[in-house]
From Swiss-Prot:
Protein name per the record: 5-formaminoimidazole-4-carboxamide-1-(beta)-D-ribofuranosyl 5'-monophosphate synthetase
Keyword Cell wall biogenesis/degradation tagged: no
Gene Ontology MF annotations: ATP binding; ligase activity, forming carbon-nitrogen bonds; magnesium ion binding
Sites where the protein binds ATP: 156-166, 199-202, 230
InterPro entries, sorted: ATP-grasp (IPR011761), ATP_grasp_subdomain_1 (IPR013815), IMP_biosynth_PurP (IPR023656), IMP_biosynth_PurP_C (IPR009720), IMP_biosynth_PurP_N (IPR010672), PreATP-grasp_dom_sf (IPR016185)
Protein's GO biological process: 'de novo' IMP biosynthetic process
Reactions accelerated catalytically: 5-amino-1-(5-phospho-beta-D-ribosyl)imidazole-4-carboxamide + formate + ATP = 5-formamido-1-(5-phospho-D-ribosyl)imidazole-4-carboxamide + ADP + phosphate
ATP-grasp domain: residues covered: 116-348
Organism: Methanocaldococcus jannaschii (strain ATCC 43067 / DSM 2661 / JAL-1 / JCM 10045 / NBRC 100440) (Methanococcus jannaschii)
Lineage, top ranks: Archaea, Methanobacteriati, Methanobacteriota, Methanomada group, Methanococci
Amino acid sequence: MISKDEILEIFDKYNKDEITIATLGSHTSLHILKGAKLEGFSTVCITMKGRDVPYKRFKVADKFIYVDNFSDIKNEEIQEKLRELNSIVVPHGSFIAYCGLDNVENSFLVPMFGNRRILRWESERSLEGKLLREAGLRVPKKYESPEDIDGTVIVKFPGARGGRGYFIASSTEEFYKKAEDLKKRGILTDEDIANAHIEEYVVGTNFCIHYFYSPLKDEVELLGMDKRYESNIDGLVRIPAKDQLEMNINPSYVITGNIPVVIRESLLPQVFEMGDKLVAKAKELVPPGMIGPFCLQSLCNENLELVVFEMSARVDGGTNSFMNGGPYSFLYNGEPLSMGQRIAREIKMALQLDMIDKIIS
């Protein structure tokens, strides 16, 4: 694991008057880059030719670093360019997927916003479950084996795959039938099936809750919420049940978009308590814990209980739903505030207070 001292030694060589904010051109990079510009930073977008169109059209990137493949971001020459540009990298789901978690932890020698140690805790289901449970959050019942299935379950797989390959089953037989079908279609592998995460299917309404923890203020902020727009399930439910049966289509849960939502106000104390508990436990289990953005993906059942089924320990894709600010982020200072701008504001404050060691790794 790259040490904090190694990163601070690199940062000490930076020109502090020319700090840039960099990220991979994907996932949540539009508001990360735009937010940085609004806070006065120059921005760097790592991208491929042909994939640079949105960042040029929206004019959010001051500099481009072109790669043949997104996975090239881990290469030493790209790291050297980022260091030459005095870059602080903001990680997101695509960055972690393409760079590779092992590389992020052990060989990506560029200062990153946040705690790079905690990223494994969102990626590995066992660690994620440990953190959520020990924080005292309500989580779905977990099944250790397909043979244990005794009710309706949802089957998920490791990594940031945006819901691809997820399926619902109500018996051991149905699990193996659907898994085999997805394998034949090239969506799952034997390794995926062996590592399947099987959990209770919770019936409820979806709230993906976007928090920001500021180490500088020691405060958990609520910036926004969204629900997921998924294919093909959200199209499938528009078809009458009789026709669905005749069509014999297997539902899938691939995230294709995000829809902003607000939660009933009486549930906000529960929302804040969940964020506070997670931050406190993360400090204990994975010091220094959460830094900056994190997300709790939850379902609200008919008893008005929020059940957390997934966690993001970095900026989540749903933050795209409030690029120009949202109802909750507006309440803090009466201004439109995206997650990207909130990240940049924390970096700017840390530079001004000479507390950059509190927010980078």
